[in-house]
């Protein structure tokens, strides 16, 4: 019978980086909000999701859930030394604005807010209309 990896091999110590500038990637879908804070090269420093903060079901897709997730990701990034952020927002979800406000409220200086939502040049056919 094969054994899984033991806890000593799996648990790695977090290395504290000292990065002043970073990029906050906010992915706001209709169902969830994912915030990833990276350095300039794209290496992830911290991340948080609305679902990971304890919100389940339709509560994940609220602005408050996005705010809580952004606060958590921002606090961990501040521990890594982040002081300035560029914010790149992707998606049409309800957590777009509240995530940016939460990062700003933490005292992190936001230099640029950029919308990088992918827009098709008549690509794939969209899903059919909902009938309720």
Curated annotation (Swiss-Prot):
Alphabetized InterPro entries for the sequence: Ribosomal_uS11, Ribosomal_uS11_bac-type, Ribosomal_uS11_CS, Ribosomal_uS11_sf
GO terms assigned for molecular function: rRNA binding; structural constituent of ribosome
GO biological process: translation
UniProt entry tagged with the keyword Ribonucleoprotein: yes
Key words, A-Z: Ribonucleoprotein, Ribosomal protein, RNA-binding, rRNA-binding
Keyword Transmembrane: no
GO (cellular component) term, any one: ribonucleoprotein complex
Coiled-coil portions: none
Entries under HAMAP family matching the protein: Ribosomal_uS11
Main function: Located on the platform of the 30S subunit, it bridges several disparate RNA helices of the 16S rRNA. Forms part of the Shine-Dalgarno cleft in the 70S ribosome.
UniProt subunit comment: Part of the 30S ribosomal subunit. Interacts with proteins S7 and S18. Binds to IF-3.
Family: Belongs to the universal ribosomal protein uS11 family.
Protein name listed in UniProt: Small ribosomal subunit protein uS11
